[in-house]
Amino acid sequence: MRIQDYTKEMVDEKSFIDMAYTLLNEKNDTMNLYDIIDEFKALGHYEDDEIENRIVQFYTDLNTDGRFLNVGENIWGLRDWYSVADIEEKIAPTIQKFDILDDDDEEDKNLKLLGEDEADDDDDIPAVTDDQETLNDPEDPEDDDVDEDLNETDIVIDEDDEDLDEEDEEEEEFEDEEETEE
């Protein structure tokens, strides 16, 4: 059965990874991940939020299923289409080559190493920003209001209160042990 003939119910029941395999087999060409997802959205009449969870699983399956091959830039194809030599060429890591500094380069004072120019730009950043200066200002009446609200709602438990509760429990346990010994 062709993927275009799938009903909404069939799309709901079938996994996206199997549908992707069928789709790529029918098209016999590589496809962008987003184009594949758009095909599924059209077939199942999905909205973005309805399909979101399935897309996460689908992307995971694409990466782990041995039938598929990422040929770069989020373009996916079927591994069956490529010879072993092609696969090695397509997925081989690219190596960036850098010029090696020789003794003359090291003596050149105008030569900047990677990251040096970024460090110089940080000199004009103030150590304290305006936001931090007013943080926890004892004279700010708004802080008092917040503290009062927190105390009224008992959302925040002071550490001292917790320690007292633990001490009370320990004393009660100790008293219970003494009573059982007598």
Swiss-Prot record:
Disulfide bonds: none annotated. Residues 14-81 form the HTH HARE-type domain. Gene3D superfamilies: RNA polymerase, subunit delta, N-terminal domain. InterPro entries: Asxl_HARE-HTH, RNAP_delta_N_dom_sf, RpoE. GO terms for cellular component: DNA-directed RNA polymerase complex. It comes from the Bacteria. Keywords: DNA-directed RNA polymerase, Nucleotidyltransferase, Transcription, Transferase. It holds the Pfam family HARE-HTH. Residues 114-182 are annotated as: Disordered. One of its GO terms (molecular function) is DNA-directed RNA polymerase activity. GO terms for biological process: DNA-templated transcription; regulation of DNA-templated transcription. Residues 116-182 have a biased composition (Acidic residues). The keyword Protein transport does not apply. NCBIfam families: RNAP_delt_lowGC. Participates in both the initiation and recycling phases of transcription. In the presence of the delta subunit, RNAP displays an increased specificity of transcription, a decreased affinity for nucleic acids, and an increased efficiency of RNA synthesis because of enhanced recycling. RNAP is composed of a core of 2 alpha, a beta and a beta' subunits. The core is associated with a delta subunit and one of several sigma factors. Belongs to the RpoE family. This is Probable DNA-directed RNA polymerase subunit delta. It comes from Staphylococcus saprophyticus subsp. saprophyticus (strain ATCC 15305 / DSM 20229 / NCIMB 8711 / NCTC 7292 / S-41). The gene is rpoE.
